[in-house]
Structures are given as C-alpha cells and as structure tokens.
C-alpha cells in the first residue's frame, strides 16, 4: 500500500470534486460565494453541488446546542458500519429531511439485510459448499429460466446504476432489493 497523499498531491488527487455535498442551510454560500472564490483563485469548479436534507430526531433537527441527536458510535457498535450506511441511504430519500429511529433501524436491519440479502448470500454460499466443494462450477448451457433470471438481473443493475447516477440511492437500493 502506498502512503496517503498529503498537501498538493492530495489536493491534485481529490479536486475538483465530481459532487460537492452540502447541507441545505448553507447551499447559498456553496452555490454562489464558494464558486466565485474558486474562480478568483483560478481553480476548477465542482461538477455538481448537491444539498442534502437534515437528519431529524424526534421531529427536530439535530442540534449540539439543544443536545438533540444520535450518537453514531452507538448505532455502529450495535449494527455495524455497513448497516449504518445502508440505513441512511435506504430509509431517507437523499436530499430530503429524514428521521432516524432505533425501531426503524432494527426493523430494516432484520427484514432487508438479515432476512433478504443476508439469507440469499448464506444460502448460496452453503449450496456451493455442499454441492461443489466450495468452488463455483463452470456454467453449463443456459436454460430459459436462467436467461430470464439474467434479464431480470440486467434490468436491476441498469435501474440501480441509473438511480445512483442521479444520487437517488433509495431507488438504487430498491432496484437491487427488488431483484433479491
């Protein structure tokens, strides 16, 4: 592994940003003033500026001064970082305000991740282990059912890719979930 870049090398490797993500309450600064500052400095502009919504807890915007919020460490300690990321991309339409609740997180974790994707992965792995000594076999001739499944997969991949390119993570995950 190479050491991470720093200084000018890091800047050259990471700027300009394809997408500059900002909170909706500071969009004006990042859509007007920040680009003007970049142009004055002779630097390229980000490809797109996208304002995300607020995370609400108990119907209120998270606030340090009001001590309202969630502790990400607690959620990650309980569910793991991948489930944490999944929840916020799936449960809250990117760009809109959204609410977090432990109950909804737990329900989605169980139904969508454990019972859906997790069960599919576990069963497929177990079958390959049981019937093929843990090695995926070389595909044989495809039956009509195989071709139909491949078409459904292709559609799901195209739908997910199209949604992700529009920053619609909820729809992208929904396309994958629909295939599963």
Q: What residues fall within each predicted segment?
A:
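Core structural elements
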Residues: 174-180
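Active-site-adjacent bridging/hinge elements
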Residues: 2-12, 86-99, 151-152
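Long, non-coiled-coil amphipathic alpha-helical linker/lever segments
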Residues: 156-170
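NTP-dependent nucleotidyl-transfer catalytic core
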Residues: 1-24, 41-48
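Alpha-helical support elements that line or immediately flank enzyme active sites
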Residues: 33-38
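Glycine- and acidic
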Residues: 12-22, 99-107, 161
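Catalytic adenosine-cofactor/nucleotide-binding cores of aminoacyl-tRNA synthetases and other
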Residues: 53-147
